[in-house]
Curated annotation (Swiss-Prot):
Its EC number is 1.17.1.9. The record marks R284, H332 as: Important for catalytic activity. Substrate binds at V122, N146. Homodimer. Catalyzes the NAD(+)-dependent oxidation of formate to carbon dioxide. Involved in the cell stress response. It comes from the Eukaryota. This is Formate dehydrogenase 2, mitochondrial. GO terms for molecular function: formate dehydrogenase (NAD+) activity; NAD binding; oxidoreductase activity, acting on the CH-OH group of donors, NAD or NADP as acceptor. Residues 1-18 form a transit peptide. InterPro entries: D-isomer_2_OHA_DH_cat_dom, D-isomer_DH_CS, D-isomer_DH_CS1, D-isomer_DH_NAD-bd, FDH_NAD-dep, NAD(P)-bd_dom_sf. It comes from Oryza sativa subsp. japonica. It is found in: Mitochondrion. NAD(+) binds at residues 147, 201-202, 221, 256-260, 282, 308, 332-335. The keyword Mitochondrion applies.
Amino acid sequence: MAMWRAPSAAGQLLGRALASTAAQTSAGSKKVVGVFYKGGEYADKNPNFVGCVDSALGIRGWLESKGHRYIVTDDKEGINCELEKHIEDAHVLITTPFHPAYITAERIKKAKNLELLLTAGVGSDHIDLPAAAAAGLTVAEITGSNTVSVAEDQLMRILLLLRNFLPGHHQIVNGEWNVAGIAHRTYDLEGKTVGTVGAGRIGRLLLQRLKPFNCNLMYHDRVKIDPELEKEIGAKYEEDLDAMLPKCDVVVINMPLTEKTRGMFNKERIAKMKKGVTIVNNARGAIMDTQAVADACASGHVAGYGGDVWFPQPAPKDHPWRYMPNHAMTPHCSGTTIDGQLRYAAGVKDMLDRYFKGEDFPAQNYIVKAGQLASQYQ
């Protein structure tokens, strides 16, 4: 089915929405553009390292065998970047949270043939979702592809921070040996109160992973988790976030970035937390007030902050989180383990196959469908 741009906004929305209901198309060669991070010297070190631009999700041969064009790049910034050159006539754009190409309303307007925006991974906040909805585009992601990867990473960072591991490691690398310098702020996880702000797939799995550590588990979300699972985990629901925070030794952020959650953890909210709290955030950097986090770490009100999400990404060299004390920050990598890459690469291939056949995607994968945003982004 050939796509077209109606002269009116209403006509455009109707035309695109009708097509996107079945996730588009039918006949003809399609131009698929992918934006991924560089593999560089590491691209050939693992045949399953498919998430980089060099391997391009491992779907080039499959796409080209079906007569489609597949353009991949890591160049996404500025008016002369490769993404700008190719977005105008692209039918499908694949992006990733780990090297986010910010798809603005201006870029959407420029993309005359665009029908489908796919996120290779989870989290589509790098896309102007209201603009995509207004244009009648379909936006989808690989829901669940990084659940295990991120939950394991969160547990790791909790332990790294509580056990004061990184300063000890740096001592060894630097030829030092000072037990007191580590032990004076090292704690067990057992008996601590851990609260997750958000109890979706990742939050629930984290609570399950924490149960063997004999922690006091709490969670805040818009809705309660299944009563049987809640009982099995032994987690307590807290409807009032600000009532939960002062009780927690560890706070883990597990919510999507929306206009409601942007900057949600500001100076005032962080001040409500227990002095010496540990915070882990693998959700989105913009949920936090950047300077408020750095100041709280410097003052000692926050004993440690860890995560892999920043705003913006890549983080500039002068980003305060790079230099604040007692942090366990890395580039955005928790959801792009080799196992995670294989899951979201397979998911992208499956959804492209459905798209070419005019079939619907799994319902949970839709972020924007027929002009409507998924509930978590409303």
